[in-house]
UniProtKB/Swiss-Prot annotation:
Source organism superkingdom: Bacteria
Biochemical pathway: Sulfur metabolism; hydrogen sulfide biosynthesis; sulfite from sulfate: step 1/3
Protein name: Sulfate adenylyltransferase subunit 2
An annotated GO BP: sulfate assimilation
Stored Pfam families: PAPS_reduct
Assembly, per entry: Heterodimer composed of CysD, the smaller subunit, and CysN.
Functional summary from the UniProt entry: With CysN forms the ATP sulfurylase (ATPS) that catalyzes the adenylation of sulfate producing adenosine 5'-phosphosulfate (APS) and diphosphate, the first enzymatic step in sulfur assimilation pathway. APS synthesis involves the formation of a high-energy phosphoric-sulfuric acid anhydride bond driven by GTP hydrolysis by CysN coupled to ATP hydrolysis by CysD.
Enzyme nomenclature, EC number: 2.7.7.4
Catalyzed chemical reaction(s): sulfate + ATP + H(+) = adenosine 5'-phosphosulfate + diphosphate
Family per similarity comment: Belongs to the PAPS reductase family. CysD subfamily.
InterPro entries listed in its UniProt record: PAPS_reduct_dom (IPR002500), Rossmann-like_a/b/a_fold (IPR014729), SO4_adenylTrfase_ssu (IPR011784), Sulfate_adenylyltrnsfr_sub2 (IPR050128)
Length: 302
């Protein structure tokens, strides 16, 4: 990796740390969304840098759908214990009581109830006025047009036509009671930037990002990993063991793996250099209807 690339990453790092510190100073009750993925791991690392040697001055929130990969939950709990940050785990109690799951209720309903409504419940319960997220503009077209400070009304909904100008590095955090801001410090990073930064900073990640032989089934054009005994096989489906890894992580029945032999960070970076598709190709929730992600964001999804 040449000096120019290092300089580029240091510029991104400085911008992100500036945004994180700005929010901590400007808002009364911020929170960081911690989804356990690679972007969350980078954002957590940047946050620890931003306030070092002090502790992170706000809690981390994980909205748990009860369908995350087991490796993700293990990694979450281990990381929280290692760094001693304040971790809030919220599950939608109504969704759990109703037995909402991606198999019987589909990706759209499952995501709305267990993620979107669960997130809104947690934000209301704790009264957070700003919430950090690890979304990047290169991931998906609706995210590409979202501001760093993304205004949300009292119902947590997003109106892409009602966004505030962001000139240079000046962000408008003025809100009325009940309104909030979603903040995206990694907006200008790319997937390749994330992986190179993870490599350079030696950031720990969930093992699922590295290739290994795993049990999978072919479903709807994706390789779905059989992560526990709740996996419901469709007629004709056969479990195969393939060398796969994940570019993105979510609920395991809705997240597709890719066939890969890349089991080191350098090999992942080499794959990224020739990749021609978005990592979100492996997320079923992005394809359950036309304009799916923008509709979800309008309803309160991250």
């Amino acid at each position: 990796m040449d000096q120019q690339r290092l300089t580029h990453l240091k510029q991104l790092e400085a911008e992100s740390i500036h945004i994180i510190r700005e929010v901590a100073a400007e808002f009364d009750n911020p929170v960081m969304m911690y989804s356990i993925g690679k972007d969350s791991s980078v954002m957590l690392h940047l946050t620890r840098k931003a306030f070092y040697p002090g502790k992170i001055p706000f809690p981390l929130l994980h909205v748990d759908t009860d369908w995350k990969f087991r490796d993700m939950i293990t990694f979450r709990d281990t990381t929280a214990k290692k760094y001693g940050f304040d971790l809030i785990v919220h599950k939608n109690p109504e969704g759990l009581a109703a037995g909402i799951n991606p198999f019987d209720h589909g990706s759209s309903k499952h995501t709305d109830i267990m993620k979107t409504q669960g997130l809104k419940q947690a934000l209301n319960k704790y009264g957070f006025d700003a919430a950090f997220g690890g979304a990047r503009r290169d991931e998906e077209k609706s995210r590409a047009k979202e501001r760093v400070y993304s205004f949300r009304d009292k119902n947590h909904t997003w109106d892409p036509k009602n966004q505030r100008p962001e000139l240079w590095r000046t962000y408008n955090g003025q809100i009325n009671k009940g309104e909030s801001i979603r903040v995206f410090p990694l907006s200008n990073w790319t997937e390749l930037d994330i992986w190179q930064y993870i490599y350079l900073e030696n950031i720990e990640i969930v093992p699922l990002y590295l290739a290994d032989v795993r049990p999978v089934v072919q479903r709807d054009g994706m390789l779905i990993m059989v992560d526990d005994d709740r996996m419901k096989l469709r007629e004709g489906e056969q479990i195969e063991h393939k060398s796969v890894r994940f570019r993105t992580l979510g609920c395991y029945p809705l997240t597709g793996a890719i066939e890969s032999q890349a089991n080191t960070l350098t090999e992942i970076i080499e794959e990224m250099l020739v990749a021609t598709s978005s990592e979100r190709q492996g997320r079923a929730i992005d394809h359950d209807q036309s304009g799916s992600m923008e509709l979800k964001k309008r309803q309160g999804y991250f």
